[in-house]
Amino acid sequence: MRKHPQTATKHLFVSGGVASSLGKGLTASSLGQLLTARGLYVTMQKLDPYLNVDPGTMNPFQHGEVFVTEDGAETDLDVGHYERFLDRDLSGSANVTTGQVYSTVIAKERRGEYLGDTVQVIPHITDEIKGRILAMAQPDAQGNRPDVVITEIGGTVGDIESQPFLEAARQVRHDLGRENVFFLHVSLVPYLAPSGELKTKPTQHSVAALRSIGITPDALILRCDRDVPEALKNKIALMCDVDIDGVISTPDAPSIYDIPKVLHREELDAYVVRRLNLPFRDVDWTEWDDLLRRVHEPHETVRIALVGKYVELSDAYLSVTEALRAGGFFHHAKVEMVWVASDDCESASGAAAALGEVHGVLIPGGFGIRGIEGKIGAIHYARTRGLPVLGLCLGLQCIVIEAARAAGLAGANSAEFDPDTPDPVISTMADQVDIVAGAADLGGTMRLGAYPAVLEEDSIVARAYGTTQVSERHRHRYEVNNAYRDKIAESGLRFSGTSPDGHLVEFVEYPPDVHPFIVGTQAHPELKSRPTRPHPLFVAFVGAAMDYKAGELLPVEIPEQSSNGIQHRDSAARPIPEPAARG
């Protein structure tokens, strides 16, 4: 009798049916959080069926944000959900695309590694996918082997692009044994208002399509805008041949952070533990319950304007908005997002109309010239009125451009937006010149991943972090032109953090006697924020916005700089509260 290999790691696959955007990523993340709260070591992976090697060159309107990992991989935004819910860093191996798989297989064929075989989807493509799935079960850098690997399969069952991934998942179950693999299928149960009925037929057809390729789901997540009654759950269990304990109703939740509670109420985590024969421990809700109290019982509300190019699609700034909300959780405050198209702030009147009722302005990252003058206009409006500002990546560059113009360089600009500008205060990084000129590939060639920075001891950012040695993730090709540092400093702007060699500007800020809170970073700190451990910069920024709202940082018009570029204030900013300890 054939025996399956002994495996210490269990694999759980999450697929989707009927429609896209049902929340597979959040479902997988929430289940991962529940298993982690049971004391298990969980890691996660996303299989994306598109032919792009990574999402780095994709339009944010089509794909949403690009989430950058510590090791510099440009990945799907769901990887951000995984990191936030698991509260641990993942690597580039957490995201696998069809483009990566085919590129690797074709490269192997060119090297002659297939010994003359005809290269086919089965077995060569599926074997490459299986290898990447099984690699997630290897011990981490500390030697710890995961108890569970949760793998989300992108797309919808029935899509041509997803078929190799589903076949690879089926083969993993065949190779490791059914007792070591669990299939979770997320499906839509639509409500028809005219008849007042919930319809189960789409889910039945979706499961039938899954079974036709050899996969029988162990559990079903029923997505609906309301609870699915027990009678319908029994019907679905019968028609789809799934245990009734594995039919899970997941109505829309008030917050994404409520989803673990929804799944736990339906006992999905206990069912998974039982089916995979995992160690049984009670869920430790201590940290998550504290988070939910902060989410649902805020003491006040603060309005933050996000001035960006892609505000029509909130997923384009997903990590930013979650980091802002987490900063609010720290202060027991609700952050109300005000989405402002950067084009609306190009004129003084437009900026006043868009920003007149907010308590803080966030300028996120981005690329291209469209909307840049609006971002600069928003910064000018905020600077002259004492309104707190946090600039991320491109946001730092816009703060620098606005400061340079205030210091007398009227034509100051970035080489990205105006190659012929007389004062390129933002210039192309030396190792990016050929790439920008078109002499090398654009994809995967930016300054990516975690880099260290050194902060000045008495700076706002050092007080926020509680240290002068920090590491943040990056994604950029342009930098502050060091030839203009002295001139820009005449505006009062301070270069408060640099790379360890002092060459690359990583942080800028105005001292509190010049402006209450304008801070910019060349990094993307939002990528390291967690709902239970908010990032220090977002804690400080939301705190400054709350001060502004309370009138402690007076929302009065600040005069333009004098001839020496510096305008002092009599009042000082409130000390920045110490954020929770970060690992």
Swiss-Prot record:
Gene Ontology biological process terms from the UniProt entry: 'de novo' CTP biosynthetic process; pyrimidine nucleobase biosynthetic process
GO cellular component term, pick one: cytosol
Glutamine amidotransferase type-1 domain: residues covered: 303-551
Region feature (Amidoligase domain): 1-278
Residues at the catalytic site: C393 (nucleophile), H524, E526
Binding-site residues, CTP: S20, D159, I160, E161, K199, T200, K201, P202, T203, Q204, K235
Activity regulation summary: Allosterically activated by GTP, when glutamine is the substrate; GTP has no effect on the reaction when ammonia is the substrate. The allosteric effector GTP functions by stabilizing the protein conformation that binds the tetrahedral intermediate(s) formed during glutamine hydrolysis. Inhibited by the product CTP, via allosteric rather than competitive inhibition.
MF GO annotations: ATP binding; CTP synthase activity; glutaminase activity; identical protein binding; metal ion binding
Annotated metabolic or biological route of this protein: Pyrimidine metabolism; CTP biosynthesis via de novo pathway; CTP from UDP: step 2/2
Annotated segments matching region Disordered: 560-583
Binding site for L-glutamine: G366, L394, G395, L396, Q397, E416, R477
Keywords: ATP-binding, Glutamine amidotransferase, Ligase, Magnesium, Metal-binding, Nucleotide-binding, Pyrimidine biosynthesis
List of residues binding ATP: S21, L22, G23, K24, G25, L26, D78
Residues where Mg(2+) binds: D78, E152
EC numbers for this chain: 6.3.4.2
Reaction catalysis annotation: UTP + L-glutamine + ATP + H2O = CTP + L-glutamate + ADP + phosphate + 2 H(+); L-glutamine + H2O = L-glutamate + NH4(+); UTP + NH4(+) + ATP = CTP + ADP + phosphate + 2 H(+)
Binding site for UTP: S20, K199, T200, K201, P202, T203, Q204, K235
Miscellaneous comment: CTPSs have evolved a hybrid strategy for distinguishing between UTP and CTP. The overlapping regions of the product feedback inhibitory and substrate sites recognize a common feature in both compounds, the triphosphate moiety. To differentiate isosteric substrate and product pyrimidine rings, an additional pocket far from the expected kinase/ligase catalytic site, specifically recognizes the cytosine and ribose portions of the product inhibitor.
Family, similarity comment: Belongs to the CTP synthase family.
Record PANTHER family: CTP SYNTHASE, CTP SYNTHASE-RELATED
Summary of the function given for this chain in its UniProt record: Catalyzes the ATP-dependent amination of UTP to CTP with either L-glutamine or ammonia as the source of nitrogen. Regulates intracellular CTP levels through interactions with the four ribonucleotide triphosphates.
Subunit structure comment from the entry: Homotetramer.
Protein name: CTP synthase
Gene field: pyrG
